[in-house]
Amino acid sequence: MLAVAQHLSSAGHDITILTAGVFREKVIAAGLDFVSLTGIANYDYRHLEEFFPDKRNLRGMDLIIYYFKHTFGDTIPDQDRCIRQIMAKRPVDLILVDVPYLGAFPLLLGSKNDRPPIVGCGVVPLLMRSADFGRRFSQPDTTPEGLLRNKEANCRFEASFQPATDHINAVLARCGAPPMPRPVFDCMCVLPDLFLQCTGEAFEFPRSDMPDTIRFVGPVLPKPSVSFDEPAWWSDLDSGRAVVLVTQGTIANFNFDELIQPTLMALADDDMLVIAATGRPATELMVVPPNARVESFIPFDRLLPEVDVLVTNGGYGTVNQALSLGVPIVVAGETEDKALISARVAWTGAGISLGTQDPTQEQIGTAVRAVLADSRYRDRAQAIQQNFKEYSAPDSITRAVESLIK
């Protein structure tokens, strides 16, 4: 969202970012106005268990329901209040919301005459249901039998998710808003006046029931790094060996034993260069084999063009950036939106999904070697790369926003 805001600012728009206080320095460093969320909406995503301690032992559907009840649902009143306070202090021509920001629902469920246009920004896979595939991890199937299975799967999901739906509707009622007209995942995408999905169509399940208000704008890629001090080992990239990059991103990176450490060990005896981007200082003791290099930060726009395989827990931005360069992927992830991303990697053929957040060394090693040995994975990744070249996210987002500003 920060990258989107910077694009709009460079196009001449005055931007105010409303987000948690933990992002204050990043927003100000980007030259944008910052307003902090307040109350329980102002939590630190890096320490969710401190703010939402009951999530600690939950997994699977129970964890998803908990997130939507409490992380997203209970924060609606404070998020809504903050938006309205900004609107009361200054003219607001348009509101751009991240997809899980349910605090815009009270405005979206009210009269259009009482609010500016609201645009949703899809920085995770498209969440709304479709007749063409079942909820969560199933892939498209439009055969008669498949359509029936899809319907049954969607019904089962909505039934199991009903406690979260009821909870969110109760919170909305306290805000003076009517209940959601559709399931919450649908409402995220169809309630806004326009919804911009930040990837290309080649990296999303096709659907025959796509609303007209949803547009693909291509991936929002980081700005090219201006300066970068190459680490001492940088010339190793020219050794002729396969280059493997492993990362756990910047959120689910508290435990390197989930992916980074087992990847280093799985490939320790292979004739390849394995680079771990930790996303934070690696304060704990790590075992670093001779063929591995570890850095807390490396600009991916510099490194990914040299990479043969990306091993990741499936962050949307990282995966889209890799595919924009035609890099095939081995993905392991269950937290946040990452299981949905894994399903799309597998469906496109641009990589291998390990189907778990905690893969074994054997699983990782086998998958990496398979991707390196079979050119079809890189071919599919490069096909997505060609699709991405048809888009210019900054231009598309700017045009979409300006079309709604009166």
Residue ranges and their predicted role:
Residues R24-E25, A41-Y45, V124-A131, K338-L340:
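Short gly/pro/ser/thr-enriched loop/turn and capping motifs at secondary-structure boundaries
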Residues M1-T16, K26-D33, I86-K89, G134, ...:
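Nucleotide-activated sugar donor-binding and catalytic core shared by glycosyltransferases
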Residues D14, D33, P117, T213, ...:
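Residues at the starts of beta-strands that form the adenosine-phosphate
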Residues D33, L37-P91, K151, E158, ...:
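Phosphate/nucleotide-donor binding subsite
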Residues F72-K151, A202-F203:
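Conserved nucleotide-sugar donor-interacting segment of glycosyltransferase catalytic cores
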Residues L18-A20, L37-I40, V119-G122, C198, ...:
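Generic beta-sheet signal
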Residues T199-V309:
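Donor-nucleotide binding loops and adjacent catalytic segments primarily
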